[in-house]
């Protein structure tokens, strides 16, 4: 099982990632709001600005302060 660094010592399983998207778009913000309502949002930002939303196959979303490009590059290694 390969783990991807989500920032600040947090890791997510690369096998379970469905999508890595930027957090600035309106659809991403709606996705975050819906996940918070359903209690499926995981905040891995440690209080920093959310830059990336990682969608997992379980329906959870992980919010990260790392850039989407760096997470996608780590996933492709």
Q: Positions of the model-derived regions?
A:
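Amphipathic, hydrophobic secondary-structure cores in small proteins
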Residues: 38-39, 44-49
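Conserved, well-folded catalytic cores of nucleic-acid-processing
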Residues: 34, 38, 74-77
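C-terminal structural segments of small proteins and small subunits
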Residues: 52-77
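Short aromatic-glycine motifs in intrinsically disordered, low-complexity regions
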Residues: 1-11
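Short acidic, Gly/Pro-enriched loop/turn segments at secondary-structure junctions
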Residues: 24-33
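Phosphoinositide-dependent membrane-docking surfaces
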Residues: 14-22
């Amino acid at each position: 099982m390969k783990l991807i660094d989500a920032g600040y010592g947090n890791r997510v399983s690369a096998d379970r990632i469905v999508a890595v998207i930027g957090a600035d778009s309106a659809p991403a913000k709606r996705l975050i709001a819906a996940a918070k309502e359903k209690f499926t949002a995981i905040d891995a930002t440690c209080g920093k600005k959310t830059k990336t939303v990682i969608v997992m196959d379980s329906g959870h979303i992980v919010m990260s302060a790392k850039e989407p490009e760096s997470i996608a590059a780590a996933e492709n290694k």
